[in-house]
Regions:
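C-terminal interaction segment
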Residues: 1-51, 59-110
């Protein structure tokens, strides 16, 4: 399973037998399509939650302003946030980054 984009804090650690398999992602991004969104919310997220270094999992809808962020808490539970207002910001807390949804979706939604 490979995400659409990844952020790694620190030095990337790769699986010995597979150079393209990252062991220590901090943030994973998936760009949703109608045919993949259930898979990304279900089986894929279940698998990703097992990665101890993962702090945030971001799902980006391609048909409307809608981003879902799951964040690992200190007790290892996950907190869920939805953002759908174009004037709102997507915050990636792991790297102290924020972007307005309107900018994220520029040239995607007309």
């Amino acid at each position: 399973m490979y995400p659409d984009a990844t952020i790694v804090c620190g030095k990337p650690e790769m699986e010995d037998e597979k150079f393209d398999t990252l062991k220590n992602p901090s943030v994973l991004f998936e760009v949703l399509s109608p045919s993949t969104e259930d898979h990304y919310r279900g089986k894929k997220f279940f698998f990703y939650r097992q990665i101890p270094t993962l702090k945030e999992y971001v799902l980006i809808n391609t048909t409307k302003y809608f981003v879902e962020i799951s964040r690992r808490q200190e007790d290892n539970s996950w907190m869920f946030e939805e953002i759908s207002n174009p004037d709102s910001y997507l915050n990636i807390n792991t790297i102290d980054f924020r972007i307005p949804l309107e900018e994220l979706y520029k040239n995607v939604l007309q």
